Regions:
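Short active-site neighborhood of thiol/selenol oxidoreductases, capturing the structured segment around
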Residues: 69-98, 113
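N-terminal secretory signal peptides
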Residues: 53-77
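Flexible, charged surface loops at secondary-structure boundaries
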Residues: 71-76, 104-105, 165-167
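N-terminal targeting signals for export/organelle localization
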Residues: 2-6, 13, 17-58
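Thiol/disulfide oxidoreductase modules built on the thioredoxin-like
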Residues: 142-193
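Short catalytic/ligand-binding loop motif for oxyanion handling, primarily in non-cytosolic enzymes
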Residues: 22, 119-122, 182-184
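Structural microenvironment flanking redox-active thiols in thiol-disulfide oxidoreductases
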Residues: 91-140
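Hydrophobic beta-strand segments of well-ordered beta-sheets in folded domains
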Residues: 18, 77-81, 107-113, 130-132, ...
Length: 193
């Protein structure tokens, strides 16, 4: 028991020590300020009422709300939302090119929401049919990833679907049919067979 408390105190000390020294902890926030000026110029901050359905993939990342994405998904027969972490090395995090090809073969629209900016521009942002999206921290009033995800998912799925106590909502893949939520998945198994 003492060992467990020691680990908790050590982790808390490291986390709060980093915060007080101004050291970023990757994944806690979006890291927009850490982008170069050239990369920041490639981020488009949209207005919540702006229609996004005709936006083409021009290599920029569009900051949107869950409601804006829901409007796009509602027009799709089958759609997959991938919460992409640009630096994830897990087998659950597949490449954008591979996933787009698999979705095309299955006639599924792929929408990619970037977890945070760090590493996003080191990839080819034009590998997907639709542009890459990011949760709009200006609209939601925070750049903290966990808070952003909660607010974004409520906008996307509605209060009836989203439940903080349901761990499956944090899976990387959300599948829709005829614009309606079907399920969340750890892997894109519905697409990649």
């Amino acid at each position: 028991m003492k060992k467990c408390w020691f680990i908790v105190v050590l982790c808390a000390g490291i986390f709060f020590g980093c915060r007080s020294l101004g050291i970023s902890v990757l994944g806690v926030r979006q890291h927009y300020d850490d982008l170069s000026k050239e990369e920041q110029a490639l981020v488009v901050w949209t207005q919540p009422e702006e229609f996004m359905e005709h936006v083409v993939n021009d290599g920029r990342i569009y900051a949107i709300t869950g409601k804006q994405l829901r409007i796009m998904i509602e027009k799709s027969h089958r759609a997959l939302l991938y919460a992409w972490n640009p630096i994830c090395k897990s087998e659950k995090c597949v490449s954008l090119e591979y996933l787009q090809r698999a979705c095309n073969e299955q006639s599924v629209e792929l929408y990619v929401i970037v977890d945070y900016f760090f590493g996003a521009f080191s990839q080819n942002t034009e590998l997907t049919d639709h542009p890459l999206f990011v949760k709009n921290s200006e609209v939601y009033g925070t750049d903290r990833c966990e808070q952003l995800s909660k607010m974004f998912l409520v906008d996307l799925l509605g209060n009836l679907i989203y439940n903080e106590n349901t761990e499956t909502i944090w899976y990387r893949y959300i599948y829709f049919e005829d614009g309606k939520f079907v399920k969340t998945m750890r892997e894109p198994s519905i697409i990649v067979q």
